[in-house]
Amino acid sequence: MLKGMSFRWSLVIPVKTLVAAKTRLADATGPHRTRFAVAVASDTVAAALSCPAVARVIVVTADPAAAVPLAALGAEVVTDPDRGLNTALRTGAAHAVSVAPGEAVGALQADLPALRPAELATALGAAAEFDQAFVPDALDVGTTFYGVRPGVPFTPRFGGESRARHLAGGAKELCVPGIDSVRRDVDTPADLEAAIALGLGRHTAAVVAELWPRSGASG
């Protein structure tokens, strides 16, 4: 670890096939589940691209319904080999290193509809102090971000209780104040309510306002 150094980042964002996305929100979103998932991913990607610490965003997906709108926002799209989440992330990371070997590489979950560029910049600045680091989710069970400095092996351990696995793998847990939007992933209706309280990005806010007019969502 070299104190005080910072890097620009290549961020890899995995977007699963949308017919399988957000199953725990299926009852709430009904036939609009795909549209909702695209909106959430769009807000995540847009916020990441607006972060000054981010040089590029690489979306890994096999679904054209996600690839087309996310590429239109400015993301680079890499085809998901469909061998699991961590394989998808490693595929995106390999692409990042091939095009920008001097950049740090991070994995960011796609379901952060309240993500704020300034809060992401704070998290990335903290991560740059360590060879590998991660941000736990709001429940302190999963992980929303994992990143490594340039030249450090990229070994993501996402899925389920990934916080414990990232700790066991030697990654530094980033207990940084003021990054609530980086930690607030959305898998359930309760998660969505918490994200609404933080303030949704414009894509998700538009869908939520249409589906639930009294939600108080605003972009």
Question: Whereabouts are the PLM-identified features?
Answer:
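Short phosphate-binding loop-to-helix
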Residues: P69-A104, S162
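A short, N-terminal amphipathic alpha-helix
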Residues: A37-V54
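N-terminal nucleotide-binding beta1-loop-alpha1 segment
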Residues: M1-L25
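The conserved acidic donor/metal-binding loop of glycosyltransferases
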Residues: Q109-P113
